[in-house]
Amino acid sequence: MANRRTDADQIKALVERCTRDVADGLLPSCQLAIGLDGEIILDQTIGDAQSTTRYCFFSATKPFVAAVIWQLVSEGLVSLEDPISSFIDEFKENGKQNITLKQVMLHTSGFPHAPMGPKVWSNSSTRRARMAEWTLNWEPGTKYEYHPTSAHWVLAEVITEVTGNGHADEVHQRITSPLGIPRILGLDSGEQEGIADLSLCEGEATPDELEAVFGVREMPPSEVNDETIIRFNDVDTRTVGVPGGGGYGRAADLAQFYQALLHNQNNLWDPSLLKQATGEVHNHLNDPMGVPANRGLGVVLAGDDGLSNRRGLGRTCSPKAFGHNGVGGQIAFCDPHSGLSFAYTTNGLDRHQIRQPRRGTSIASLAATCVI
């Protein structure tokens, strides 16, 4: 990995930091990858896994879906200000008729925990029927709360409506295949060999620990719980291609995707729209913990307010760094200032609400300093 722009000592420190959690028995395995100048310069697997092992990306999947939407905007098939109901008629029910595509991408659309679930998510008609039932928690555009899965089911249905193809196929045909990345979404049973099964790591934070760090004695309720997380081990869940979190692949695939975003590889995106999506903040609203969202159109930007670590990007990246992490410690970002992209994946889902984000901050902070 000889490259005059890399810092060998920092790379060594990064690998040692990632190795420590596996050696200490906190995680069963992990992968990490660094991209630079359009290539993968570090591809490391640690623990009970192979270099070919694939991991669940969880919400690090979301930018792949957004990347399709960017193309559709450039092609004139959709507009960011289009109401979702103009594509999905059923969506207009219960006061949702004016919610725009942009609001859905920014997580300000007002249905953060609207249910979908295995009983209805396998085909378009049942998904649309479920969307008709969804109700609003607030007036769209007035508040920000992360939508773990609901928003991207809507984006997936828009993709299907305007292309005539399933969202998982469109992600592969438009994004991953042109980049030489294996299919990540909608994997048939015969395509699932070599995926690391997820396991829960014991040891939740106590109420006193939570209060000392976050100022609350319990974390806000979320649909992302142990049961829903472990469901991503199921063959059927892997097959359906959950658009907000059901991508599977290697850390190197994630790092390569972000290199493609940095360099607009193969001219996959309109340059001005790519800049608008990944380089501009469109959502400044605070999250429920009081941290400004700093969201672009499908990614999170680090920002210059000293809160980049609260957004999952560590403490040492530039304000223009952007990415999107996934539950359980998945990390994926790039930094236009240095040209680095970084990804970290693990199948050990640390349930400790303080240890896990601190691990992420430590790893991301080290990674961002590996390129001089």
How would you label these PLM feature ranges?
Residues 51, 59-60, 64, 72-116, ...:
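Active-site helix/loop module of the DD-peptidase/beta-lactamase fold
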Residues 84, 97, 147-151, 273, ...:
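Short, conserved alpha-helical segments within structured domains
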Residues 50-51, 135-141, 151-153, 234-243:
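Flexible glycine/proline-enriched surface loops and loop-helix/loop-strand junctions
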Residues 90-98, 143-148, 247:
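A glycine-rich, coil/turn loop motif that links secondary-structure elements
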Residues 63-68, 150-157, 252-256:
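Short amphipathic alpha-helical face segments that pack within enzyme cores
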Residues 118-121, 129-133, 137-139, 144-146, ...:
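Recognition helices and adjacent regulatory flanks at domain boundaries
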Residues 2-45, 56, 61, 143, ...:
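Catalytic loop of the DD-peptidase/beta-lactamase superfamily, centered on the K-T-G motif
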